[in-house]
Amino acid sequence: MSQSTYTLQCISRAVAFMSEKTRDGKTPDLEAIATAAGLSKYHFNRVYKLATGETPQETLTRFKLARAADQLRDHEVSVTDAAFAAGYGSSQAFAKALKRVLSASATDVRIDHERLGNAIETLKIPQSRGEGSVSIEIAKLEPFEAIAIRTDSAYPALNERYWALFEAAGDPAIVEAILGQPYGDIGPDNWNTLRFDCSLKLSAPAKTYPENIVETQIVGGLALLKRHLGSYDHLPASIDDLYHATLCLKDVKIAEEPLLFHYLDDPEITAEAELRTDVYLPLVA
């Protein structure tokens, strides 16, 4: 089975799962959707967006709005009841979502039957988006040890963590690589829940480190590699290129491991436009 076929089957399972849950008035979280899809929770959000043109949250919003809008066909059902039936906590939350997606109020669509029908059909279809270009190679990483500081909800403000790692390393000459691993989507919408490991590969590790620094194993193996050039703020675009490549390559599958960033330049002495970051997407061997 090709990766594109496998991924589309996973996406289909995710869509079916979300559809079923929203019909029951429930709103599953991202991890539950990824589990139902059979895709790594670390990569699911962006893979789903590339395959469908929207995020899982946007799909859930469409499904919930479609269910609520369908309820509005019945004039015996209040807007509040329609909102609760679709999984919204209040009629205000439903009204805001409807206004954002359709630029209309519940009253507007309810009194205009044609508009209501068009709204329901619109909510069934994701909005199309463009795709980026792809410049990818396959690499093999040997396993290695690193020292790391694990953070939660700190990305992208990580400078102090890396300074602490360099201080613990002692001699800058023994630093072989500056690394990072995001355990999820690094898009701004996810910063408040993102775990991110800041790490260094050293040629001569110390015997002991401060309590906030742990020794960790980078598992290595096959990976898709793209060299990102420019601001770290634009890393998501290069990550999307890697995920897009998995849809085009035959017989590759994303591993249950986080992305690996290898920061090749010092941002204090390198112009932002010239910063190089090697981005690795681990694959199942």
Residue ranges and their predicted role:
Residues 50, 54-58, 62, 66, ...:
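A solvent-exposed interaction/effector surface
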Residues 3-55, 71-91:
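DNA-binding recognition helix and immediately preceding turn/loop
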